[in-house]
Amino acid sequence: MSFIPHKLEQIKKMLDTIGASSVDQLFDEIPRHLRADTLKIKDGINEIQLANLMRKRANKNHHNINYIGAGAYSHHIPAAIWDIVARGEFYTAYTPYQAEASQGGLQVIYEFQTMMAGLTGMDASNASMYDGATALAESVLMAIRSNKKAKSQKVLIAEALHPTYLRVLETITKHQGIEFDIVNLDSKNGKTDVTKLEDFANTNYAAVVIQSPNFLGQLADVDGITNWAHKHGALVIAVTNPMSLAILKSPAEWGDNGADIVCGEGQPMGVPLASGGPYFGFMTCKMAHVRQMPGRIVGRTVDLDGNEGFCLTLQAREQHIRRAKATSNICTNQGLMVTAATIYMSLLGAEGLERVASISHENTQTLATELAKINGVSIRFNSAFFNEVVIDLPVNAETFVTEMEKEAIDAGYFLGEYHSDLANSIMVCATEIHTSEDIKEYIEATKKVLARIGG
């Protein structure tokens, strides 16, 4: 019997319906040279032969040392984490709507919420969002719903916000009447000049978005921007790397009254790099805004016998209860990734997280300092950073990155795609996984490549 599920008549009907002339046309976005017509495997080989062949081919892969960052980070993941996550109780668990049958999963989410609220200094956390960009978009929608005093649906955003986050934000809010104004960054320090905010003082904003560390790795003037936003009646949305909060003050301490909503990408905490996902976004907020928070929230309660238990709470916010009035059409969470993050934070504890963050900063500082000793290479901005820093090169950065790949090093993130004035700049990121020997190899490879391409 055939294991192909669709008959030719069904395929033709499908193509006619969507207006495609052939199945190949469905995949014409994929360049021809990337498509494989055959797998180059002999017919009739047995499983042992096939396994040996795949091993030989896999050995042709090589793993560069990664210094890219820019929103997804290489951190050490203790072996115990994914060994636990892969257990059937977590790996195959379904939505925990039936609380009496889902106490283990619900408790994990509750512990995650508790730790994220503690890390960010906020009162409440949801069970996670799809990713950092989605979490920001939902935070903006949440802020507009919450800020009843705002006379507009305008949001003020610093130019140093991650460009991918901005694109997702614009896509999700495109047809919702929300407008964005952008504050240009200071070319000398790579962050928002607080004095420039006065140019926007006559506009009413529902929210102000502050990313710190920002896309260029710099620490924003969070106190000044937060106070300015609150003075002008806007809620403050903090976008941050959760790992940085182990050594930096929490968003709850920004300015006189702290941020109102905190969000970001949770991938650094126990989730491996995987071509863009699956990752998870986190969102926390002050209690005043919790009823406008999207996604799931797990609460702690007691049963009829007085025993402690956990359940999904405040569900009237969600679209499976009140679709027309829901806070979001997100009615899920990244449960498996959250489980990994919960175990990661539990295993490392506060001291472990602080150690990881400190070593990451120190390694980035060392790498940047050593690079700046090379003729023609310099640190771009004169302000504080966490674990990413922009480096100016005497050659085209994209060419430099390509040549460094030949030295088995992913040298950094090419910034010219988003900032034309940074065509000769890369952003480098180091974490606790990079050794002093790795950094020495990077420096020597840089000298070698610059000599080769004329730097």
Swiss-Prot record:
The keyword Cell inner membrane is annotated on this UniProt entry: no
Keyword terms of this UniProt record: Oxidoreductase
Protein name: Probable glycine dehydrogenase (decarboxylating) subunit 1
Function, in words: The glycine cleavage system catalyzes the degradation of glycine. The P protein binds the alpha-amino group of glycine through its pyridoxal phosphate cofactor; CO(2) is released and the remaining methylamine moiety is then transferred to the lipoamide cofactor of the H protein.
Any coiled-coil regions, as ranges: none
Organism whose genome encodes this protein: Francisella tularensis subsp. tularensis (strain SCHU S4 / Schu 4)
Enzyme class, first EC level, given as a word: oxidoreductase
SUPFAM superfamilies reported for this sequence: PLP-dependent transferases
Similarity comment: Belongs to the GcvP family. N-terminal subunit subfamily.
Highest taxon listed in the record's lineage: Bacteria
Gene Ontology biological process terms from the UniProt entry: glycine decarboxylation via glycine cleavage system; nucleoside metabolic process
UniProt-listed Enzyme Commission number(s): 1.4.4.2
Reactions that this protein is recorded to catalyse: N(6)-[(R)-lipoyl]-L-lysyl-[glycine-cleavage complex H protein] + glycine + H(+) = N(6)-[(R)-S(8)-aminomethyldihydrolipoyl]-L-lysyl-[glycine-cleavage complex H protein] + CO2
Summary of subunit composition and partner proteins: The glycine cleavage system is composed of four proteins: P, T, L and H. In this organism, the P 'protein' is a heterodimer of two subunits.
InterPro entries: GcvPA (IPR023010), GDC-P_N (IPR049315), GDC_P (IPR020581), PyrdxlP-dep_Trfase (IPR015424), PyrdxlP-dep_Trfase_major (IPR015421), PyrdxlP-dep_Trfase_small (IPR015422)
Chain's gene name: gcvPA
An annotated Gene Ontology molecular function: glycine dehydrogenase (decarboxylating) activity
